[in-house]
């Protein structure tokens, strides 16, 4: 897949995605993405074995690199960052409509600051040249999906409850909880109401 767009802050944005659902005939999924713009550049690669165990537990690996360079963006202060990350994740089907996932990701970020960098960044780093900000993130999620069609649903519910914790072993410590609920109802044959 190939996509392109125009953004007031990022200029011309180009994205390329390669998705192989049956990589080399193994039944495993490989997904590679490249998204480039004037400010943000992201490279990511993921590999998933959907039948890691006989009872349907999946296992996946992810690696990524994310670069941010705001020197050409006059609307915000100048800073550069380079992030590298890698993680492992597992998925467990609980029923036909329920799914549980958990994973561990390490993120390693270097931030370069300048005299006109945002104050929040200068305060966080404690100096005007920059710093490193590393984290080890443990994440888990429960998903319930009763939609009649994943691409063009007419009725059903999609729920997602997720939690993420940065373990107290590196620079960052935080926790995040998130709940999303989307409800679909067919009003007529050609019109579906969605409440999010």
Segments the model singles out, each with a brief description of its role:
Residues 82-88, 157-167, 173-196:
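Transmembrane beta-barrel strand/turn architecture of Gram-negative outer membrane proteins
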Residues 1-147, 151, 157:
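Gram-negative/organellar outer-membrane beta-barrel architecture
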